[in-house]
Amino acid sequence: FPYTTLFRSDPFESNFCKFFLRNFNYLKLKRLICTSYSASPIVGQQLTLVGWDEEPIKRGNGYVMDISEIPMANGRGISDSDIDSLLKSKKSGVKRLKGDGDFRSDECIEYMKQADIVVTNPPFSLFREYVALLMKYDKKFLIIGNQNNITYKEIFPLIQENKIWLGCKYGDMAFRVPDYYKPRNTRYWEDENGQKWRSFGTICWYTNLDHQKRHEDLVLYKNYYGNEEDYPKYDNYDAINVNKVANIPKDYFECMAVPITYVDKHNPNQFEIINANDIRTNPDTPIKAHGLIKDKDAVITTQIYAKKRRKRLDTNSRSEEHTSELQSRRVI
């Protein structure tokens, strides 16, 4: 069934744009809409585009590309030169926006409303706002974000309610970067063609499109009973602590606090993600908007656990503050 796909991107040099143009027919798209933000530093760096008004694209106003047909050039898709020719033609579907292409503008929101699926890499600093718009207009989406977004008070409740989940790729991702990008000491390289690359270990896809990985059971090997000292209870929550996803016990069916990395492996048919506020055992423990076990309230003072922890520390200078820091990554 054909879809109308919207992606908000850097100008049409964006690999998001190129991917969907190349694969327009292969993906059986009905329509492709791309809104472009005028303040991007890569405007006009690779392609010189001409809008419907026959003026070259330049900074100031944003632009939109709205395409419903791409001629089959080489079977599956089209080449970069085909893309260049297409976008320079009067049939390119490119026109100037009234504003700068900010996704929060009325005209960009109107384009979002027309889309069946939204695919993009939103500004990380505006991730909350972008997701809020997607939810407001009930859009299917596939977007890139940081792993830390999981813990946002605006995001984690959506994950808990199975309104958002992670995509198939989680963690290490490599990205092409422009020629002007300055070399870095780590996670940076150039390939044999001189293309610059960077990789990031904290990037993932967020989506509400179902996929097979989401329904794969997490294989469990550990036992809780007989190893209770390895799973101490929290002082302020009715839950045991599990240090690693690999240590989730197969014979325990009550509440467990697990590392945030579990979310990538969550199968809603196998486990339920709950709100930590619902299992508070200390009435003085404040209600947390994000619903996680973290911060200073995520303490464990079980003597056996404290003894084992001290053995792993190099000195006795590590205090309860250190323990709280370790626990801050746990999630119900």
Predicted stretch roles:
Residues 117-123:
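Amphipathic alpha-helical repeat scaffolds
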Residues 228-320, 324, 328:
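C-terminal lobe and adjacent flexible extensions of AdoMet/dcAdoMet transferase-like proteins
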Residues 139-152, 163, 167:
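Conserved beta-strand signature within the Rossmann-like core of class I S-adenosyl-L-methionine
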Residues 169-268:
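A conserved mid-domain beta-alpha-beta active-site/ligand-binding segment of alpha/beta enzyme cores
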Residues 2-6, 325-327:
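Short, small-residue-biased leader/transition segments that mark boundaries at the very start
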Residues 126-133:
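A short, conserved alpha-helix within the catalytic core of class I
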